[in-house]
Amino acid sequence: MSLRSPLSKVKGLGSAKEGTGHWWMQRVTALALVVLGFWFMISLVVIGNFGYEHTVVWLSLPLNAVLLSSFVMTLLYHSKLGIQIVIEDYVSPPAWKVGSLLFSVFVHLLLAVTGVFSILRISAGGLS
């Protein structure tokens, strides 16, 4: 016996069976952001002087470059997950919903590539 009406079965309304994975990834990325954010704040205190030379030296350490890249990618993935939920819940017209989701993915991907490329470029010897 099903609790769904025949009309809802035909329309395909109901669970998409993907909510748990999305919910779980939001929690995992939030936990990773707490850890990476704590590392980033400690690193800012350790740097002390935010001059260009000090920042390049700090970022030239491979561990710092990897952790900062992880921080940027995790932050943007977490943001993408949250914005996806807002779009799915509050944008009604299907064309706007699909367009908004595609635009969100494009912007987040562009920001991630730009951020990681910038970190790698600076860590490989600065901008000179």
Specify the residue positions occupied by each region the protein language model found.
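Membrane-embedded alpha-helical bundles that constitute the cytochrome b-like, heme-associated redox core
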Residues: 1-128
